[in-house]
């Protein structure tokens, strides 16, 4: 007989669930460990089958902006280890940070002993090691902006660099169904308080917006039909339960419909409400 004992686990953050789902989806359908956006160029048609290629281009884009002379790198929010593996393949010495046990385990499985993974939040990282470059690839938005630069500077070698590739909130008017990201104005204001010089600042919103078009297409042509089918099934088989659910969870259901199935999560709104940027900063110790 199997062991049906349930083990009490600590609560799992919803972001971790989303990333773990993304990993399972990518591995099963594309044999890919990438969890970040794709970087879409004119020669790559926007389609779900081309997503792995666009994600590889995203990693290549980051690597192309690593300054000369960099030898050691800290990859903050390493996901499943795809970027770190690519970096070690180019002879960089890489360590990584991951607060998610599921993703950290996956990263260890593909990196082996090539990379030490700190299984902690970046804000809580404590090590004597220092690095030539710290990379935040779609992880910057999850870190306290009031603490991130002070913490990063602790682990930078003299004259080291910080590379951020992530999206930020713009000052566009109106309500956006697209969450995430620090305010871009706050980001620039915060930078001014630290001994950092912006060496590169590139807007890649146009090249990353097609990812949202793919998500919207999946929501409209897969997510919404499945959602409606579920409601039709429950309503037909259990009408009283259906009425209770609609009454009890009315506001949450309306929010889900508005956020995911209204068609507002599209590339046009992404380009309006978000600014996706690659920002490279050099430390300028006084």
Predicted regions and their residues:
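A short glycine-rich, Lys/Arg-flanked "PGG" loop and its adjoining helix->strand segment in the class I
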Residues: 146-161
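Class I SAM-dependent methyltransferase SAM/SAH-binding core
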Residues: 74-76, 80-124
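A short SAM/SAH-binding and catalytic strip from SAM-dependent methyltransferases
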Residues: 133-145
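Substrate-binding/catalytic lobe of Class I Rossmann-like enzymes that use SAM or dcSAM, i.e.
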Residues: 175-264, 268
């Amino acid at each position: 007989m199997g062991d049906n004992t349930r083990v009490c686990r600590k609560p799992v953050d919803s972001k971790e669930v989303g990333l773990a789902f993304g990993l399972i989806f990518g591995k099963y359908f594309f044999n890919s460990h990438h969890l970040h956006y794709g970087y879409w160029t004119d020669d790559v048609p926007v389609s779900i089958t081309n997503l792995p290629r666009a994600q590889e281009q995203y990693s290549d884009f980051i690597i192309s902006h690593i300054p000369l002379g960099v030898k050691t790198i800290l990859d903050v929010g390493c996901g499943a280890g795809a970027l770190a593996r690519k970096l070690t393949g180019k002879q960089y010495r890489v360590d990584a940070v991951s607060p998610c046990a599921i993703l950290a385990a996956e990263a260890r499985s593909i990196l082996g002993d090539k990379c030490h993974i700190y299984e902690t939040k970046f804000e809580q990282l404590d090590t004597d090691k220092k690095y030539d470059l710290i990379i935040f690839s779609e992880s910057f938005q999850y870190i306290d902006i009031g603490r991130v630069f002070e913490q990063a500077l602790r682990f930078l070698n003299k004259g080291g660099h910080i590379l951020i590739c992530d999206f930020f909130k713009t000052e566009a008017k109106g309500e956006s169904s697209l969450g995430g990201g620090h305010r871009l104005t706050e980001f620039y204001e915060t930078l001014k308080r630290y001994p950092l010089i912006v060496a590169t600042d590139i807007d890649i919103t146009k090249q990353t917006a097609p990812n949202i078009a793919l998500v919207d297409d999946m929501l409209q042509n897969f997510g919404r039909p499945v959602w409606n089918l579920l409601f039709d099934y429950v309503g037909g088989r259990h009408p009283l339960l259906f009425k209770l659910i609609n009454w009890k969870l009315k506001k949450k259901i309306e929010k889900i419909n508005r956020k995911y199935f209204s068609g507002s999560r599209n590339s046009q709104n992404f380009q309006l409400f978000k600014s996706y940027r690659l920002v490279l900063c050099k430390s300028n110790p006084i």
